[in-house]
Amino acid sequence: MSKPTPMMTQYLQMKEQYKDCILFFRLGDFYEMFYEDAELTAKELEITLTRRDKKNNIPMCGVPHHSAKVYIERLIEKGYKVAIAEQMEDPKQVKGMVKREVVKIITPGTVMDDMISENESNYIASIHHEEGFTLAYSDVSTGELKVTQLNEDEMLNELSSVNPKEIITNIDLNEVLINKIKMITDVISRFEVNDTFKQADGVDQSLQPAVNLLLSYIQYTQMRALAHIDEAVYYEPVHYMRLDMYAKRNLELTESIRHKNKKGTLLSIFNQCKTPMGNRLVKEWIERPLLNRQEIEERHNGVELFNDNFILRHQLREALTHVYDIERLAGRVQFGNVSAKDLVQLKYSLEQLPMIQSLLKEHDEVIRTLDNIDALQPLYDMLEASLLDEAPTSIKDGGIFKDGFNNDVDELRYASKNGKQWLNELQAKERERTGVKSLKIGYNKVFGYYIEISKANLVNLDVDAFGYTRKQTLSNAERFITEELKEKESLILGAEEKLMNLEYELFIQLRDFVKTFILNLKQQAKNIAVLDCLQNFSEVATKHQYIKPIISGTKVLNIEDARHPVVETVMERDQYVANDCKLDDHTFIYLITGPNMSGKSTYMRQVALISIMAQMGAFVPASYAEVPIFDQIFTRIGAADDLVSGQSTFMVEMLEAKNALQNATDNSLIIFDEIGRGTSTYDGLSLAQSMIEYVHNKIGAKTLFSTHYHELVDLEQTLDGLNNIHVAAKEYNGELIFLHKVMPGAVEHSYGIHVAKLAQLPAEIIERSSELLDEFEHNEKVRKGDSNKIIQPSFNLFEIENENTNKYNANHEHDLIIQQIKDISIDELTPIEALLKLQEIKSRIK
């Protein structure tokens, strides 16, 4: 390989500095990538991979600079970092190598402008670990910066709420922890703090390492001062209901398990906000239900206000429709990358504040969650007086200010405008003089103004006679200049250049004026977001007929005609079967039995979701709801192997159960669905019973515990705080009909084979399973003497005593076969696999 060219040497030196980035290297009108970057970019963006310097065969690809944002955005979405190397000199004015510098590094956590979703916060987080963990996170687009201290489990739970796009650390995290973090985000970067970067002011010394690390990284990527990130706010998650990552996932609060998006989530129901700030805040409220009764009731009162005043809500929604993202606009003003178009959007937003102020004037005592709403009239007046409504995005091309705002702008604009009029008149005169109707006057940055005549019209034209000087030859035309044209050019271009420079200077002054209102702007953005969330809650409550819950000062949970907020929206109106739930100090555990597909999981989820909705300040889907303040909600629902950490379904189940049993209090809610399915019948039964007893005797948490172990129903006789309930179903003409109604007492049958029939398992398997079930049930009755007693609490849960070992082994094998049938995943079984499974069962019986 020959020695690289000076330009490639420049590229390689830059790439050495930014090894973890894809380097976008500016060459004229393109950004070019080389070597591995080119191969990776071409693959990810599906663009053409070519070769530069055939002797060295260097892989190369490129994208036009004017459309680069689209390509960069796609790379960022895939988790890559992009370093932008710009030409710092005009190639036409430089002899030799053009100076280039990396001016910005774009990463998933530091994206700004319109590359990020307006309805979601775009957080970047840092983790520091000494005795415990310090977590700091920021949304660069708004300047928000928060910090807290936690243990490892709390840190992971908080990360799942924050959901950062990128995590920074300067310590070596163990592999197990990294794997857990990667369940939240794949982008984990190692970075060392540089003393030249911004340090945190006014932050407790124990918090500074995490905050300084985060600020240093952001400043490193943005390559400019971070004036807009001016305060680190310390908070404690204990002020909110604890929802661990399992609960958020299982309850599908903001992301669905199946599709990994908002569809089918609680967030999808409360997606009626009118502003980006509101949409971001409602997601935060869903994931952080309140623990303070007064704060909860203040939100409820705000929702009730809008419920009782339809016209008020309608007018507010109409006003909010015209409000842009004030929070991020303020962030751009502080950061220094605000455009004239941004300030016009800010003006439109401020225009709505007097109307909002007027609407709420009589209701200050109700909307206590708001600080003073300020119309910011001086700021609005300045923006209205100065900016053209159609102001451009670029602040260097002029066309920003209204006529009459500045005398110098008006004079230069007049000179420039008259110059263009003179050009139009000259074009008409030259067409008349030469007789060439297609003659035109054009402009480019290389030659300035010129007269262009097609070659066909030049055949019989004596250009010298008209005083034309040839300047450029094209394939089908010639370009000329005249003395008169060059004289006017200097006047016209001089006015235009002065005008653009003056408008740029005035815009910087206007931006600095807006900066003086930043704190107030940010406060009004928060006010708007809160109002938007409250009217949103009211809109949803009205649409779906929700009611105002009572936040009890007791431990009573009493919900009548409860409905699942998401499931009911995909059903025909009035088709959803509502159910009650009443738990208190005397009855705090429901043991739930019923067939598969009968609605046990839906029932448990709806109780948890209604509790969350009540504590986040929303109304709830019920006819009556008295809800205690739960400090935590724990769930164990569904079955899925943890492929990341290599854990089986059963191990995941046990870890989630352990999390609840270790951390729950008598003020918590526990949802356990089919604990013990992933092991043998007796192991599973023993574990399920021991967990119920532990919750009953040691914790006292409100608990919904569904099971297929019918032996457990007799616990009602020995545990005072436990009641049996079941989801009803009935057989009719050999068919199973799900009633979806929760009734007192235990169910008599699981109807597993009926469910298999509904799933259209092969008829041969259904028939044979029925025969086996009859045989197993008969043998079970004989073995138990037709009794059905639970394992006594004093019994060793992991040993089975039996006088006849051989008889025990035979019966145990029967249980294993039954369990094997129960464990068949019907949804994932093909007909061929079903037949093979049947053959396996028959072989075990023989």
UniProtKB/Swiss-Prot annotation:
Instruction: Kindly name one Pfam family recorded for this protein.
Output: MutS_III
The source's domain of life comes to Bacteria
Could you confirm whether the keyword DNA-binding appears in this record? yes
List the SMART domains hit by this protein, alphabetically: MUTSac, MUTSd
Q: Which UniProt keywords apply?
A: ATP-binding, DNA damage, DNA repair, DNA-binding, Nucleotide-binding
Q: Name one GO cellular component term.
A: cytosol
Q: Where does ATP bind?
A: G594, P595, N596, M597, S598, G599, K600, S601
PROSITE patterns (alphabetical) = DNA_MISMATCH_REPAIR_2
**One annotated GO biological process:** mismatch repair
- GO molecular-function terms, A-Z: ATP binding; ATP-dependent DNA damage sensor activity; damaged DNA binding; mismatched DNA binding
The record describes the protein's role as: This protein is involved in the repair of mismatches in DNA. It is possible that it carries out the mismatch recognition step. This protein has a weak ATPase activity.
Entry-linked HAMAP family: MutS (MF_00096)
Family note = Belongs to the DNA mismatch repair MutS family.
Stated name of the protein: DNA mismatch repair protein MutS
